[in-house]
Structures are given as C-alpha cells and as structure tokens.
C-alpha cells in the first residue's frame, strides 16, 4: 500500500449512455490484473442484472487497482463508477466530488452528446482534471479527427492528446492508464486532521446493515472509532472497513485520499444519505461538504397488485427496494377502482421504469401502474399552499385560487437535419424556446423550458423517433410556474373512476378527453346493458362514447301474429336492461388503465 498520497489517483469515467464506459472499466480491470480471467465478465461493475441488460449503470461502484507505470513506480488507482443517466444527476455530482480526475469517453461514431456535456460541466465545477478518450476507433464509421475537433469546439478541452482507443478490442488501454498517472493530481489531505469523508453511495446488506461507500478527504478512519453524520447528527461506531479490489476485502484503516467501504451498524439507508459528510463524534470537522441536498422525487405513480392477496408481498418488496434506494418513496393509498396499493415517488422516468421492472422481475409480482403524474402546487382561496401528487386529491375548482406546475430546462443535442421536427415536438409540448446554437456544421444544441408533466409522458420516446435516435436529452428542474390546468375526470355510467383521472392543460382537455373515451370504448368489454363513458371537467361533460349492449333476440319465437305481441316482449327486455343498469357495475380491465398511458398525442 502506498505510504504517502503521492501514489494514489482517484478518477471516474464519464460518458453518454452506450459510449462504452462499462466496457472501458472492464478493460482497465483486466489490464491492471485486478480481475483474473476466471472472474471476468462483461460489464463487471454493473452488479444488477437489470443494469447489464439495459446497458446502464444505476448504482455507483468503486474498485481499487494496482498499476505499475512505465516509470516502474506502483500506483493505486481508485475507479469510481458513476451512473450516466440524467435521473441520477445528483449521484453523479457526489461521485465526482470524490475524485480528482475524470476520463471523458466519447464515441468516435456519435460525437459529443447531451449527457456527456452535462457531466463534463459537473466535473469542471469540481475542478477535475479531464482526460478525453475517443472510443470505438475500430468501427468503420469512426471519425477521430472530427470528434477531436468537436471536443475542442463544444466542450473547449484541448483534445490534441485525446487517446484513440477501443475498449472492445483493448486498443489504447495502456495509454489511458499512463495519462491517469501523469495528469490526475494526487489527493491532498492530512491524515492527522479531524475526520472528513463524503458518502457517495450506500446500500443495504442483510447481514451487516447499511454499507457506506466513502472517500476520505481529511483524517483517518479505523475500526471501533465513533463517527457522526453531519446532516442528522446521528452517531455510530465503525465496525469494519474495506476496499473493493474488485471483491470486498477488509482493511485496518482508511486514510486521507483513500476510497473504501464503512460498516457502522447503520440500520436505515435513509440515515446514510448520498452526499452527507462523515466526521468524528469527538472532534467534528469545521467545514462539512457544501451542496448536500436531500433528493426529492419528481414523478409519482400508483402501484397496485393485480391480486389483492399480493398486497403484503408488494409492501415487503417496496420496503426492500427502499433499503437500497433512499430517493425512492412510497406510501399506502386506496383507490375505489383498484383497491389497496401504494403511491410511489421516483427521480424520473428511467428510475420509475427500473423500480417497476425490479418489482416484477425480482419479486415476481404482477402489478397495475397508473399514469405518472408530477407534484402540483395548489394555492386555495384561503391562501394556503398544498402540494399534490395525485390528481384524485385535487380540491374542487371553486376552492382553487391558482395552480402551479414544475417546469424543466431541457437541453437537446441533435443533428442539424432534425431541428425542425424537434422544435415542432417541443412546441406541441407547451415548450418555450430559450436558445438554439449550432456546434459546428452537423450538431445543434436546443434549449427549451417545458412543463415536467409534458416530459414524463413519452417525450423521450417521441424525441428519439423524430430524430431517428440521434437526439439526446439532458434536463434540470427550473422551478414552478402558474398554468391554466384542469382536472379531467372519466365517468363510467355516471360513476367517476379515480384511477383514470388526469390533470391536463385546459386547451388540451377536450382533445385528451375525447381520445381517452375512444380508447376506453375499445377496451371495456360489452355488457348486457349500455355503458356510457364520459369525460368531464367539474360538472361539465366534454366528451362521450357508448359501449352498446348485447341483445338477445327475444322475438325469434314469434311467427306472424299481432305486432303488439312483439312490442310487449321488446318492452319487457328494455325494462330488464334498465333494472340491470341500476344494479350492475362495470368491471374495468387492466388494459383500460394502460390505455390512459398510451393515448397517442
């Protein structure tokens, strides 16, 4: 183990999705001999099956590598893997805070994309040394000089020394390691000072409680030491320390500059929040890390078990997921249409998909999920402000003074050919254009303010389809703005179905209501009586569709004879249908709730 910090290098890899970040990490591990051939597997650091399958990194991981440089000196390299997706932007910023350098991976066939830029700016905010790497040079469509020029033009980094590499073929890996050793500064920090460490990830281990991934900046961590978390003042005793190389192995101490895991009998992941500062209980540090914030969910949806008996199992599954994911929230809710379930909060759409997929895959649950909604701010006539994440909880129109909805600032990177289609899409989503600048001859950066409610629905999919997959999106929350919003209720035979109600912009309400009714007419099965499907704003019905009734041919047995005989039978049938309608209730199939999600814009 290096005696001084001079031989330690802490770095992370930043890249847009699919630019080859996890593959590069695999090659670095193999090149330094950290992972033996026996354990090697693709995307080594992505532990979750889902991460491998979707090719995305969800949780941060770290690994320590020993590397003998070309000058014969042994170095200790700590790779801190960061999630690349915009939903996890805060986790990325905390992971970057734990490093001194970053490898910027750019795909030689794609060039610079939106999330690459977003992460680079964060890295520059943390004063990291950035090493550009142009990946996938083995592909026939690779354009290395073009990408080099783009890195200089768009990001403003000197790309003359950018390493051309192919993580897949293992080209250029040695050069990357040399650049890390040469360019990334060693960590500063005094091992004797009061302890100061940042938590950049934490997860739950069923045997040891919460495991915290920390980077020590000042002081030393040792077993039996009393530590304190700055944000909530809770105190714990360190039980064990370890490092990943790449499998966890225990160490006796972690000193300034090092990265490792701490187990300290913490029972809840909520206590060890990402971005919090760890310090000594007896002599706390004077300056904890700035920028700590509690991550708030932005998107909500109801999750209900299809079988009522799975309710407890769903609760257990959600509890377990929450142990590992402090940003995920849930609370019980009841719906007259769907029974008992939970209202869950997520960071964004990808986060929502991942949680739902994990519930279905890891816990074998079959679920109904309602349309995603966002948090609205309602000021009532008394002047009170309430936040509402469920359309069903919206107060009656008469009591609302104003309604505000969250807005995002979206940065879209695209090819110049697709600008028209993208501007049209943003316009349709009630977007306001803020900026449009050309980056070279082929790429363009478009900045729009768009309401979050318009983005959560299917904006990302639409963006990909109008740009043939080339556009990339990055967004941050801008704040709340007042809007003319109404609650659209769906009534079936005059009864409102709470799980189908949505909050929409008044201009869109008629259009949306009509489409919903048409969609529901297709999925609600015929009954023995007529079923009326109506869309309403308050007491005003704005659209209606009817599902026709089944009819038995009651006059089949009459041959000839008087018309009054037939009329009597038909009248009797009508009476019966009327009575049925009064007592009958319509069973709404699962497809109906999904239909709400799939209404084409």
UniProtKB/Swiss-Prot annotation:
- Where, per UniProt, does this protein localize? Cell inner membrane
Q: Where is the tr-type G domain?
A: 6-188
Q: Which reaction does it catalyse?
A: GTP + H2O = GDP + phosphate + H(+)
Q: Which PROSITE patterns match?
A: G_TR_1 (PS00301), G_TR_2 (PS51722)
Q: Which UniProt keywords apply?
A: Cell inner membrane, Cell membrane, GTP-binding, Hydrolase, Membrane, Nucleotide-binding, Protein biosynthesis
Membrane topology of the entry: Peripheral membrane protein
Q: Which residues bind GTP?
A: 18-23, 135-138
Name the domain of life.
Bacteria
Q: Which CDD domains match?
A: EF4_II, EF4_III, LepA, lepA_C
Q: Does the keyword Cytoplasm apply?
A: no
Look up the record and report any one GO term of the cellular component aspect.
Answer: plasma membrane
- Please provide the Gene Ontology terms (biological process) for this protein: positive regulation of translation
Q: Matching HAMAP family, A to Z?
A: LepA
Of which family is this protein a member?
Answer: Belongs to the TRAFAC class translation factor GTPase superfamily. Classic translation factor GTPase family. LepA subfamily.
Q: What is this protein called?
A: Elongation factor 4
Organism whose genome encodes this protein: Anaeromyxobacter sp. (strain Fw109-5)
